[in-house]
Amino acid sequence: VLLIRLKLGLPRIDEALEGGLRRGELTLFCGEPGSGKTALTLQLASKGCHEGLRVLYVYSDGLFPYPRLELLARKRGAPLDDLSSKFYVLHLKSLEGLINVVRRMELALLNYDLVIFDTFTAPYRSIKVENKRETVLHNKKLNQIAAILKKHAIDYGEWVVLTSRLRSPATNEEIFEDLVASNVLTYWSDNIVSVAKTDLPHQRKISLLKIHGQGSRVEVTTRVVDGFLEEVD
């Protein structure tokens, strides 16, 4: 596969990314639940399949939304055969499962061009953090996992994409997760894409906070159409 840049299919976002996500990069999509992170990753996965990439989608939020992916393929006029032959889903239920997937990637036992973890930090939400020492240990473990994924992306010229929720001022587990996303994932990510809800129910604001390792302030307004994101003219 000779493709060098992988587009999201949102013209102004892809332009700001200088043509798209580069091989060897770790990209973070972050936002509150329901903001549109999965919509973006599905769009990216569909685009990857259409470009001939082998896509692994590691999903941890219940049943994988196959109908949405098939709908997107039909909208783009892409053959569904591409999905069946190039697209593979792994369901995650625990932190041990996440560690196992990353270990298999490290040992080159999983051979894909694009690997998406959605939601990457979900396995950590099941962990009960009872003291500061446990928080430090879990942060250290996640730091190691993120470092392995970053090195893997570089060594094998792959695209690795993670999604993470933002902090909600509700519970300690969300505070812990926000700490993880801010201090660990942000550090290792080459690109950071924030997806936020607005006052309008079907409108989303996409902010590029980091582009190819450099800070950014690019913002683009999008709208939700058939469960996916399109730029607003």
Report the location of each language-model feature:
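Conserved P-loop
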Residues: 22-104
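Pre-Walker A adenine-sensing motif
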Residues: 8-20
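A conditional alpha-helix N-cap/helix-loop micro-motif detector
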Residues: 6-10, 38, 95-98, 139-142
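Switch/connector loops and helix/strand junctions flanking conserved nucleotide-binding motifs
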Residues: 64-67, 97-99, 123-126, 169-172, ...
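Conserved catalytic network of the ASCE P-loop NTPase/AAA+ motor domain
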Residues: 19-21, 47-51, 79-82, 106-110, ...
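Charged, amphipathic alpha-helical linker segments immediately N-terminal to NTP-binding catalytic cores
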Residues: 1-3
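Phosphate-binding/switch region of NTP-binding enzymes
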Residues: 152-233
